[in-house]
């Protein structure tokens, strides 16, 4: 599943090709992805101008000039490919190379704009992705978004906010951080990395980072800073390039080579002077990587 940095990378790669362009035709090559397409989606998008691209959590937002927003989720293996004539480029790559097999091309944006015609192709072998059309004014109240917490790099995420959310919680810290109601867009990879950077165990109770009076402990502030830093580093690196996620220009992001604990089971911990070994455990069906020696 793509995490926030991967979706942000895709958004930034698509923006030069899509923003300001007119959708001459939206071509749907099947009736559904994970869910059926909205009724008359092709007719509603064709002829419209794309006024901007955005992102909320792990969702890509395509704003149209009629006040509607096309909401897209990449699912497990979705990717976008930009084609201009015989040339093609892809924004976001990840461990297993994404396929360019045209039999998995399910949605094609035929665009007109400066620089001539181009196509933006959505490819999704597993078809776990989906698209929906939402009035822009209604986005915040839509079921996809209404319960989401603040963005991990936004001003609303702070130690005081997390103290309020975590107070008296016996829930494991990692599970609390993955709860999208607490923080939007934060996923398994970056939670593992942020916990390592802040020397916090994924299995400790979230409430242990809050004083009896409800104030954040010092380590909670360090955790917030680590979350911000690891997300910013991954975005700057173009995403983690893990498994199925490809950048629009086809380049391999380098953040995966900077992982400190994720997917490093049995390797030495990188904390200076630690001497511990990265371990893998399973929490709520997901792999957790951490160093028990320095993460407490």
From Swiss-Prot:
GO MF annotation list: 8-oxo-7,8-dihydroguanine DNA N-glycosylase activity; class I DNA-(apurinic or apyrimidinic site) endonuclease activity; damaged DNA binding; zinc ion binding
PROSITE patterns hit by this protein: FPG_CAT (PS51068), ZF_FPG_1 (PS01242), ZF_FPG_2 (PS51066)
Active-site annotation: 2 (schiff-base intermediate with dna), 3 (proton donor), 58 (proton donor), 286 (proton donor)
EC number in record: 3.2.2.23, 4.2.99.18
Alphabetic keyword roster: DNA damage, DNA repair, DNA-binding, Glycosidase, Hydrolase, Lyase, Metal-binding, Multifunctional enzyme, Zinc, Zinc-finger
Cofactor, how bound (note): Binds 1 zinc ion per subunit.
Cystine connections: none
Entry keyword rRNA processing: no
Assigned protein family: Belongs to the FPG family.
NCBIfam families hit by this protein: fpg, PRK01103.1
Protein name per its UniProtKB record: Formamidopyrimidine-DNA glycosylase
